[in-house]
Curated annotation (Swiss-Prot):
Lyase among keywords: yes
EC number: 4.1.1.37
Compartment(s): Cytoplasm
One Pfam family linked to the record: URO-D
Positions bearing the site annotation: Transition state stabilizer: 73
Quaternary structure note: Homodimer.
SUPFAM superfamilies (UniProt xref): UROD/MetE-like
Protein name as catalogued: Uroporphyrinogen decarboxylase
């Protein structure tokens, strides 16, 4: 099968600009909320291959999207490491057993794939359900981002993580190396189970200084790229560091196929900077989806007009879609991208 999304990542010709949306299976869809209610709680939803398949397919059935993304959570790996993941309504993820010191890190196992079999069963179930309609994206969190959750136990302050970074960097590097080993095995098994491409979400890479970003985040993502490509050289891999616009040249040098960008950088500048090396994914501000259809169309045209050429670009938001967006506006977005991308070529 030839898919525009995969071809764009590999810089092969595409029939139109492909689009998928971060968190496209989510709370903004009434059918998702119904399935979530049926599951009882978020973790049960994630850990049921059948229900994960159901919610993965919902946006594919509703919109003319060019890729599906596995419905799961980036914190499946820390959960399998025994940290006791749970979710508080309105507060996000928490861990019952956060990492406090080197002793805790040394106890962590990296051989997790047996405990994550529900994810791989979900991938194969989704792949079968898709029946080659669109490609399937697998994913993981980056080691740095996973470590922040594991050390903080939740929240977005990062005081404990940065305390370890400055006071005991060797301990943090050990944790990041263990996570890297687990992520490589995790993504490779997703590919074996049917994922057509994979993505690494570095949600909190942008909170680091440049040197710390290179040492504590990108260094390990580069190892992941190498570890995935060693086993699956033809499977494209995308890296996305939120607020990482100033690091794009470094990211493009990892050997990845695509880089995700947010709305704090201009697409045309990114294309000039790294477009000769990697495909680019992004970068509409998610808040545009609160606007009128006319404004959505205007903003889509603004983004599309910045990219020159007929491949190497995937339209997406600059971050995940928000839960209170009107699904009708998502349809307008998707249809606009496909219509106007043909005009812009």
């Amino acid at each position: 099968m030839s898919f525009d999304y995969i071809n764009a990542l590999l810089k092969k010709p595409t029939s139109r600009t492909p689009i998928w949306i971060m968190r496209q299976a989510g709370r903004y869809l009434p059918e998702y909320r119904a399935t979530r209610a049926k599951a009882g709680d978020f973790l049960t939803l994630c850990k049921s291959p059948e229900l994960a398949c159901e919610v993965t397919m919902q946006p594919i059935d509703r919109f003319d999207l060019d890729a599906a993304i596995l419905f799961s959570d980036i914190l499946t790996i820390p959960d399998a490491m025994g940290l006791g993941l749970y979710f508080m309504e309105g507060e996000g993820p928490k861990f019952r057993n956060p990492i406090k010191n080197l002793k805790d890190i040394k106890k962590i196992s990296t051989d997790l794939n047996n405990d994550l079999s529900y994810v791989f069963d979900g991938v194969s179930t989704i792949k079968k359900s898709l029946n080659n309609r669109v490609p399937l994206i697998g994913f993981s969190g980056s080691p740095w981002t996973l470590a922040t959750y594991m050390i903080e136990g939740g929240g977005r302050i990062f005081a404990s993580t940065k305390k370890m970074l400055f006071n005991d960097p060797e301990a943090l590097h050990l944790l990041l190396m263990k996570l890297t080993k687990s992520v490589i095995a995790y993504l490779n098994q997703q590919i074996v189970s049917g994922a057509d491409s994979v993505m690494v979400f570095d949600t909190w890479g942008g909170v680091l200084s440049e040197q710390n970003y290179l040492d504590f985040s990108l260094y390990y993502m580069a190892k992941i790229v190498k570890g995935v490509k060693a086993q699956h050289p033809n499977i494209p891999i995308t890296l996305f560091s939120k607020n990482g616009g100033k690091y794009l040249t470094h990211i493009a040098n990892t050997g990845c196929d695509g880089v995700g960008i947010d709305w704090t950088v201009e697409l045309y500048q990114v294309q000039q900077e790294v477009g000769n090396k990697v495909a680019i994914q992004g970068n509409l501000d998610p808040a545009v989806l609160y606007a009128t259809p006319e404004v959505i169309e205007r903003e889509v045209k603004k983004v599309l007009s910045q990219f020159k050429g007929d491949t190497g670009y995937i339209f997406n938001l600059g971050h995940g879609i928000t839960p209170d967006v009107d699904p009708e506006n998502v349809k307008i977005l998707v249809d606009c991208v496909h219509t106007f991308s043909k005009e812009c070529r």
